[in-house]
Structure formats: C-alpha cells, structure tokens
Design a protein with these regions (language model features):
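Transmembrane catalytic cores of multi-pass membrane glycosyltransferases
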Residues: 8-12, 24-29, 159-264, 292
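Transmembrane-helix motifs of polytopic, lipid-linked glycan transferases
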Residues: 72-92, 387
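Membrane-proximal, lumen/periplasm-facing interface regions of secretory-pathway glyco-
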Residues: 314-374, 385-386
Length: 394
C-alpha cells in the first residue's frame, strides 16, 4: 500500500512504457531506441535492448499505476513467511539458503524501487546466481541446465546487463582452480577442479550463444561492449562511483564486519563474488543491487548458525535467554553498530535536502528556461541537466 501510494519513483519508467506502447502499436521491434538520445548525440546508435521488458512494463501499466511493487513483494514475502513457517513447524533447517532461490530473490524484489527492465534483470541475476552456485557445488544436480533459458530471457528483457551473467560465469570457471584454503576465516576445499572448470566453461559458451537469440543478434553484444561505453555513462548518476555512505554498501560492509567478528568461517566461493561486486560498486553505484544479492546467502547462513548456537545455549542454560556474542565478537558488533549509526547521521541530512528524495519542485526560473528551449525528448533529470547545459554552452 505504501509503494502504491508513493507511485513510481524512477522517471525511466515512462521512457520504457512509451517504448513498449510503440512496439505493441506498430507490431515491430525498432532497430534502435528512438526514445534515448544520449548515445545518438555522440554519434552512436542506442539499441532497444530492453524491448521485451518495456512491453512487460507497458502491459502492467494498463493494470496498475505502480507495476512490479505490490505484486512481486507480496509474492516473495509470502513465500519467505511460508518457508519460515515450515522451518518452525517441521524443523526443516535453513542452513543452506541456496536450497531455495526465493530467499535470494526476496531482497532483490524489495530493491526494485522503480518500474524498470533493469529491476527484472536483477531478479534474473538472482536466479542465475543460484543456478551457478548449484551447478558448481552439487555435481549431481542438473538445475544449471536451465541457465541458458534464463540467458535468453535476460537478453531480451534487459540485454544491456547481460555481461554481468558472463562475468560471474567466468568467475565460477576461475574458482574451479582455487587451491585448498583455511586461513583468516576463509575456507575452500578443492574438489574435481577439471570437471568443474569443464562444466562451468561449457555453460559459459552455451550462455553466450543463448544470448544471441534476440532481435539484434550479435549487434547486442556490440552494443554493450562498444556503444555503451564510458562516454554514454558520463552524465548518468547511477554510473558514477559509489560513496561509502551509501546505505546498501555500508550495510553489506558492516555485516561482513559482524561475520568476521563472530569468527564464522566464510567459503572462498562466497567471498569472491562479494569482493567482485564491492569493487564494481566502487566504480558504478548501480552494481550495489547485485552486491546485495550475492551477500544474501552468506547473511542467511550466518543468521541460521547464530540462531542454532543461541538455541543450544538456551537449552544448556535451562531455557533462559543468553547473549549471542561474547568477548571480541561482542566488541566488534558494538563498534559496527556505532559506525552504522554515525553513517546514518551523516547520510540523513543529504536525504533531507536532496530534491530527488524530497520531491521538491523546480524553481520558476528553471521552468521558464525549459519552456524557452522547447525540448522534445526529456524523460529523466540527468537528461534535463545535460540538455540545458548544452544549450547554455551554445
């Protein structure tokens, strides 16, 4: 209800529903996205790589003014609540969150704060991350064979983010050759490295071939490797480096401190995806959503271990509640909590004064300038800024 009341927060939503409407009305997929001018103004051609995602958003907009929020969150939260009920009622342990990818998808659904094909792509990434882990860790499982199907959907719903699948698939190929490790809280058991590398390598090749099943074929790959370059990202806020004060990034780093303080063993195959996403997030803030996805399995495993240990302490203490942390673990937990409070205090004034957060209207002088320019294609705030800046220079 809160999401429905607030409405769509991302202005890119309107760009995508207009594109989806045009495709539905003309019954044809455009050779290029005529509603995006940034690449075109630089002499590049913007591929409508989110054509299917735009159609989905357009169709949902005919039903609900705020698509993807109520429906997805209700489904995933209900599934999460049901899983917890099963755990409490029948004692089904949740030590391995990869047993059910709904746990991983839950937070990604909560992170979809705007109706965009990219948000659907994040859900596809969560499913892909689950399938990659399942194929890597369970030699008998065949679920990973579904990944090429996910790649096909991904290439058509939000093909511009498909390289993230290839990057993580490559990471799992490289992790197959990791040695045995048991130091600094990181553990890894090397098992059948050649077989794992062959499986993950073959999967990467099939995924790349599956991604070609889109209206543009290999031109889609040319788009996200050549056309969608640094020049096109220069004026876009979500492609800027992330600040440490970002609440999502700070939460992930703080939770890592808590896990390390509790002396919980971390699998190297859990840590490396997190490290890669942290490095990418430091360069592009939009990767923080993927960072949260790869953090969720470790968070669930940590909480499950803590709950089991607390339960054992309570039984030994006659059923009375006892502190979960002691000594250094308790100290680092307090330090992390204090740092989180400090970060919130620092970040709160920015939220309070940020026009994008407060919904403040543009001043009258700026509105008059926009009317004088008579722009034809302005759908986001950074486009407005870039357009007026270019006009002022002229």
């Amino acid at each position: 209800l809160i999401f429905e009341y607030n409405g769509v927060g991302d202005s890119d939503y309107y760009w995508h529903i207009v594109l989806g409407r045009e495709i539905c009305q003309t019954h044809s997929i455009p050779t290029r996205d005529t509603f995006s001018w940034l690449s075109d103004s630089l002499g590049l051609q913007e591929t409508a790589h989110s054509w299917l995602g735009s159609i989905i958003l357009y169709k949902l907009s005919l039903i609900n003014s705020n698509p993807m929020y109520g429906q997805l969150i209700f489904v995933f939260v209900s599934a999460f609540a049901y899983a917890l009920f099963v755990d409490l009622a029948w004692g089904k342990e949740l030590n391995d969150p990869f047993e059910n990818c709904l746990f991983v998808c839950l937070v990604t659904a909560l992170m979809t704060w705007g109706g965009r094909p990219m948000n659907i792509g994040i859900l596809l990434f969560a499913i892909s991350f689950y399938l990659l882990n399942d194929g890597y860790r369970n030699s008998e499982s065949k679920k990973y064979r579904l990944l090429p199907i996910v790649a096909i959907f991904w290439a058509n719903i939000h093909g511009g983010s498909l390289p993230i699948l290839f990057a993580f698939n490559t990471l799992f190929v490289l992790m197959s050759f990791l040695p045995d490790v048991n130091t600094f809280g990181l553990v890894n058991e090397r098992e059948q490295p050649t077989a794992k590398a062959r499986k993950m390598g073959s999967l990467l090749a099939v995924n790349m071939l599956a991604g070609l099943l889109n209206p543009y074929g290999f031109k889609l790959y040319y788009y996200f490797f050549i056309t969608n370059n640094e020049a096109t990202k220069r004026y876009v806020s979500e492609w800027q480096p992330c600040a440490l004060a970002d609440p999502v990034v700070f939460f992930c780093i703080a939770f890592l401190f808590v896990i390390v303080a509790s002396r919980t063993k971390i699998r190297l195959t859990e840590f490396l995806p997190i490290l890669c996403c942290l490095l990418l997030t430091s360069r592009y803030v939009r990767i923080r959503s993927y960072l949260l996805v790869v953090m969720i399995p470790l968070i669930f495993r940590f909480l499950s271990v803590m709950m089991k240990e607390q339960e054992n302490r309570m039984w030994k203490n006659g059923g009375r509640f006892t502190m979960g942390f002691t000594g250094k673990s308790k100290f680092w937990t307090i330090v992390t909590s204090a740092a989180l409070v400090v970060a919130c205090c620092i970040y709160a004034p920015f939220i309070a004064t940020n026009p994008e957060k407060t919904g403040d209207k543009m001043d009258a002088e700026f509105v008059e300038l926009l009317h004088a320019l008579n722009p034809q294609r302005m759908y986001t705030s950074y486009n407005c800024l870039l357009y007026t800046s270019d006009a002022a220079d002229d």
